[in-house]
Amino acid sequence: MSAQPISDFYAYPDAAGHFGQFGGRFVAETLIGPLQELSAAYDQARQDPSFIAEYDKDLKHYVGRPSPIYHAERLSREVGGAQILLKREDLNHTGAHKINNTIGQALLASRMGKTRIIAETGAGQHGVASATVAARLGLECVVYMGATDIERQKINVYRMKLLGATVIPVTSGSATLKDALNEAMRDWVTNVRDTFYIIGTVAGPDPYPRMVRDFNAIVGREAREQMLQDYGRLPDAISACVGGGSNAIGLFHAFLNDPGVKIYGAEAAGDGIATGRHAASIAAGRPGVLHGNRTYVICDDDGQITETHSISAGLDYPGVGPEHSFLSDSGRAVYQGITDDEAMAAFHLLAHTEGILAALESSHAVAQSIKLARELPRDALVLCNLSGRGDKDVHTIAAREGIAL
């Protein structure tokens, strides 16, 4: 991959939704109209002070923002090297960063006069966040979820139902996140008149990658301000897990034009990239088209999407948001694979040293931050996005370790 010199990362996407060669709108003709309607409505809303004020109000009083930055002192001492700081998105209402985006899109849905929202989910956090805001705004909610993910995320499935959502199992393909997204798109095409599709990550056709990024960008804006206020400087490195990549781009975006801040994404290496059982789209994929946008995907020599594997349902996706593909090719961000075993070890170490149960997704970023810290001096600062809490993963972890609950 050859690096392209970029003078201003905030100039992207362009008017057609492209991040360099990535992004765009590769969809059936039946979706062009709905996407144009959505794009126009979003562009109008994002410039409306009353919409922004309503969104900010909900972030403060409903979500509980700002989320703090916590200095993981015992973890840092245990690891040696740089100081590890955690952006505590796990403390948000519903337990993850996902609600930053769902509250924004649900407010937009109401503004557009839609009465029904649909969503896809992998780990269940986006489904829970969508069901939550639907209840908050009095909207019908249908969540599509792969049957494999339903089995490994039973707690979140029940949470969605408690919140009034209908959860529809998807059994096609590998019965995971990509298949749930396919079914949700089919629903949207059929019911577009009254239905708003809340995509949970920075993938999909334009305007979704930029819209989901914008609603999650509060994470990085807060973090940048908190770093300057509490530490008097920006971090030396930042890290976040990357499946589709919404929590990561939310953190990264505020630092893109700060060359002194190194940016790292932690992809799911599963059993190891060499085994083929992984979900590391950038580290081991190639450019292709998936779910309406051009990006790095995991596919065979004929361009067919292949099955992925990760212990983390939220990272078990054969693509990645197009802006991440662009940041990788430009050289601005580095994406590394973290194995299931490395994520598990980081989960346990964080729990034992800091009393924090991180989501398995977030544990990939913790593992990456530990590696980075060991390579840096003690006065360096590594900021890790702790994107979600691990309550939902306790059964998965226990089962992997042979413990019956």
Swiss-Prot record:
PROSITE patterns: TRP_SYNTHASE_BETA. InterPro entries: Trp_synth_b_CS, Trp_synth_beta, Trp_synth_beta/beta-like, TrpB-like_PALP, TrpB-like_PALP_sf. CDD domains: Trp-synth_B. The modification N6-(pyridoxal phosphate)lysine is found at K98. The keyword Lyase applies. It catalyses: (1S,2R)-1-C-(indol-3-yl)glycerol 3-phosphate + L-serine = D-glyceraldehyde 3-phosphate + L-tryptophan + H2O. One of its GO terms (molecular function) is tryptophan synthase activity. The keyword Amino-acid biosynthesis applies. Its EC number is 4.2.1.20. Pathway: Amino-acid biosynthesis; L-tryptophan biosynthesis; L-tryptophan from chorismate: step 5/5. It is an enzyme of class 4 (lyase). GO terms for cellular component: cytoplasm. Keywords: Amino-acid biosynthesis, Aromatic amino acid biosynthesis, Lyase, Pyridoxal phosphate, Tryptophan biosynthesis. Its cofactor is pyridoxal 5'-phosphate. Belongs to the TrpB family. Tetramer of two alpha and two beta chains. The beta subunit is responsible for the synthesis of L-tryptophan from indole and L-serine. This is Tryptophan synthase beta chain. The gene is trpB.
